[in-house]
Amino acid sequence: MRGPGRALFFFLAVAAFFAATIGGWRWHEGARVVRLGGDRAAYLHFDIVEVRLETKDSDLDDEFRRTPPRAVVTRDGETLTTIAGIRELTLTRAAPGVWSARWPVPWNAPVGSYFPALLGREDLKERLRVAPFLIGRRAPIPLPKGGFVVATLESVAPLSTMRVKAPDGTEKDWRGLLDWAKDLGADAFLILGGQSPGLQDGQVWVETNRGILPEVAKECHARGLKFGTYAMFSLTMSKTVKIPGYEYGLEIKDSKPVVTRAVSIREPKRLDDVAAFLKPFADDPNVDFVGVDYIRNALGGYELTDDFAAEMPGVKVPPEWPKLSRDERMTWLARKKIMRKDSDFIDAWQWWRARRVALVVKELKRRLGDAKPLWAFTLTWDKGWHHGQDVVMMNDAGVDYDALMFYEADKPQYDAMLKDWHAYVRRGDAQLIPGNIFDWELHQKDPAGPAEFGRRMRRAVDDVYGDGPARAVFFHDLARLLWGRLGPWGTKGWADEARSISRYVKSRAASAPEKKP
């Protein structure tokens, strides 16, 4: 071989040598790198972060098998304690070179970057590559500007035969309800459309008004009202009739499970049926929003025991757990919850149920689409947590209008609830619509009657958020306003107060700058 050929051969040999050398160096460096981060880049508030450590160093992997790696999650340099008192994570081997632990996102965690940190391994400092993860929020469909007032009707009484005494004293058909909505200063009418079980054997829904609701929607639009309809998700209105194919929630009495009238929140067929019921309304151009009530484990919930123990980080079960029967495991959870001595355990139970509800909402929203706002009713004791609801998770999952049911509490309880809400949530966290009920009995027959109703509503508007007034309210419900327990003030007295509240919330909305979640 001579001349150019020999030179080319020499060049290729040198190139191959350097390629092999550099490639070997890169492989060696890659094998040395230890990566620590989340299993994805971003999370929402109902998520459980999988903190992962990955290495191609087999010697280090073997070392971790003898002494598992430990980690924490930090924000702004501060180590965080999350749900169930979880602070330090001990990672377990998920695959060769892969170690992981689960970290539930804290209640209403601030938006921003979070950094996992490896503990006790200063020797790996130069090799460690840490990837932060983001906790964010979903942006909901905005509320109408200038304040928003909703009048509800929680009734499946036949609209076709309904007679209503209108505000002017004349007797009308169901259209009289819309007269009242307008008279109260409402911008929207929301009606219960889906209640279970049906009137016939095996029927899922009471079908009495289903066919007439599109006509009601058109009439609302003709009057300048928005229209919405909702379905009850978990609770059914019969103590004896069970819908075929459903799993129902379980309560524990005398150490034995008792079937309730609430469908289990994990029942997939219920999600199918609710989505199928609401979808035609979500697609109807005359329907402005759709919603759900009882979107929680309304009764019982102990059928979820095994799921909770398996899925929720930080839950410590007794050593004999695998040997216990299902009834015994449910009884253990019931006693643990009722005793309320373990605050971390209660925190875990509440968070995990709220997560399960949020996952149901997320799937419901996916099936209904993003074109229309999704409304949900939320109970207000302990910010909803007591009932397995969290408005921040709900917002992230797909609820656009979260209606807070400030019902039934006496004055000290009402003050305590509002104090909790004020400390917990800000206007950018979720779109809250506080509401109150036309019912003197549920105001403890306060001598002020409707004036107490109004006082509570104004307080909720002013104080539910920690940084400004609410921009919407709802009145529950027109059936109670017309035919309910109203004391000596009657319909007119309560309606006058509601009208005043409508003006109040709109004036507050106009004077306060809008803050987007």
Regions found by a protein language model. Give the residues of each.
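Mature N-terminal, pre-catalytic/accessory segment of carbohydrate-active enzymes
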Residues: 11-191, 203-204, 208-211, 506-517
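Active-site-adjacent "subsite" loops/lids of carbohydrate-active enzymes
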Residues: 143, 149-171, 211-217, 226-285, ...
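The substrate-binding groove and active-site-proximal loops of carbohydrate-active enzymes
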Residues: 153-168, 197-210, 257-272, 345-357, ...
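Aromatic-lined substrate-binding rim segments of carbohydrate-active enzymes
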Residues: 176-178, 182, 190-238, 348-368
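Substrate-binding cleft of secreted/luminal carbohydrate-active enzymes
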Residues: 399-416, 420-516
